[in-house]
Amino acid sequence: MGRKWNNIKEKKAQKDKNTSRIYAKFGKEIYVAAKSGEPDPESNQALRLTLERAKTYSVPNHIIEKAIEKAKGSGEENYDELRYEGFGPSGSMIIVDALTDNVNRTASDVRSAFGKNGGNMGVSGSVAYMFEYTAVFGIEDKSADDILESLMEQDIDVRDVIDENGLTIVYAEPDQFAQVQDALRETGVDTFKVAEFEMLPQTDIELSAEDQETFETLVEALEDLDDVQNVFHNVDLK
């Protein structure tokens, strides 16, 4: 799982550098989650999970509150969750998740980003079967052995617990996100470096320096699109 964690860490670092963009994306996601049910995280599981994820990116309270208030009031925007799949250089695979109020615009933008940067879009299912939807937590100051022992005592099953570059990483089933996070808090975890849903590749590939440069340009072009929430891939970024 080490390479997978390296990619998650790299993506997190890039998002942390682009605060205005990540805040805008979370503002939209919080609004959609709040509109999907009660605008209260105590009774709206989707909203609660979105807010927990937002905390790891230090999304300011005023952005969170504005999105929730908008959902409570006159917010009329309706968003569709979309997934696009495609390929980059040398067999690299990419998944693009979007949240949009204009499906045609987003499809055109994503297709253009692929086409102009050495990639091409595939059909639905052409890539996703090579990835696993996973809940991922990154924790400081707790060893993997201590975390695993505590989870076992609480009868909580997870996919894996590893030590990686000074952090303990927990991989779990996505539908157990809240249960696992609550159990981790029972172990004394107050702050999560990462608390996120990821599409993790079953296998990673390495690219030549030239192909990796092309690939990174492609991923950046996709991530820069306003409607794109997440980009996942199977490249080991060295």
Swiss-Prot record:
Q: Report the GO terms under cellular component.
A: cytosol
Chief localization: cytoplasm
- List, in alphabetical order, the GO biological process terms annotated in this UniProt record: regulation of DNA-templated transcription
Instruction: Enumerate the SUPFAM superfamilies for this protein.
Output: YebC-like (SSF75625)
Domain of life of the source: Bacteria
Pfam families the UniProt entry points to: TACO1_YebC_N, Transcrip_reg
**What is its subcellular localisation?**
Cytoplasm
Molecular function terms in GO for this entry?
Answer: DNA binding
UniProt KW keywords: Cytoplasm, DNA-binding, Transcription, Transcription regulation
NCBIfam families from the entry? PRK00110.1, PRK12378.1, YebC/PmpR family DNA-binding transcriptional regulator
Family that this chain belongs to: Belongs to the TACO1 family. YeeN subfamily.
| Name of the molecule in the record | Probable transcriptional regulatory protein SSP2054
Write the lineage as a comma-separated list. Answer: Bacteria, Bacillati, Bacillota, Bacilli, Bacillales
